[in-house]
């Protein structure tokens, strides 16, 4: 014996929405009739189909129409004994009026809201009439505090320290503090770059004197066609240090990129990218080999080897590469001669 199917009831309104109270009452009444007529009196009943109540609003009265019975009559098929009985959904006008009054008193009706109720007031007021005046008058002493704060942040001995402080004083005296703070931050960003957060490293030429003789020779071989000998570069470096530092802001991006770079091989000394700001790229440009030497304090060995092997930018091999090729070819010929003697 298979389990009986579940019965369901669906209410559909063809005109307007159904009142919630009437719908609940019809549903309870229909379920009661189903349980009373089928489950109690006929325990063997199994295949009860779902039923649908369709309410049509005619002249202000709700008239239930049994959609299933109408469909069966249109098809010319009589209801089968397994379909069960049709539930009657009649209701008097007095009962409908009572349900409507109860719904209105509970506030569950679908009509318009009663805005005359004192509780139904506006929750959010977007008018600007009651807002206070929030105009702000800057404190004249704030400039002094900003100056002291920035002066404490700037590293002592930095070449841009005096320039930043002088620019700050001019901004504070010539404009209000509403714009002085912004101008000060922009000045520091363009002048000092990202070196304010870290102490500046003093550039000393004495640290370059401990380089091995082979490194000095390699750097001299490279520096001759570009900037003279290593000694000439050292003398020119002291001269460049006294030049204008107007191009410091242009190197801020290079400084940040250098500090964020993750070196595969850790250098012996900490890189000093601030040394590049001592030179004006428009007046006295530096090649990438000299830039490497100034930043890391040692000549770029791998770069110089590559340069000696593949030549300058013109494409011709350098003297060092030619000598290396001659030496390699000479050794190769000697090996061939030795091989012939061995065969004899």
Curated annotation (Swiss-Prot):
Its main location: cytoplasm. Residues 331-344 have a biased composition (Basic residues). Keywords: Cell cycle, Cell division, Cytoplasm, Cytoskeleton, Mitosis. Signal peptide: none annotated. GO terms for cellular component: cytoplasm; spindle pole. Residues 319-330 have a biased composition (Low complexity). Residues 71-115, 234-255, 310-344 are annotated as: Disordered. One of its GO terms (biological process) is mitotic spindle assembly checkpoint signaling. It is found in: Cytoplasm, Cytoskeleton, Spindle pole. It comes from the Eukaryota. Part of a checkpoint which monitors spindle integrity and prevents premature exit from mitosis. Belongs to the IBD2 family. This is Protein IBD2. It comes from Eremothecium gossypii (strain ATCC 10895 / CBS 109.51 / FGSC 9923 / NRRL Y-1056) (Yeast).
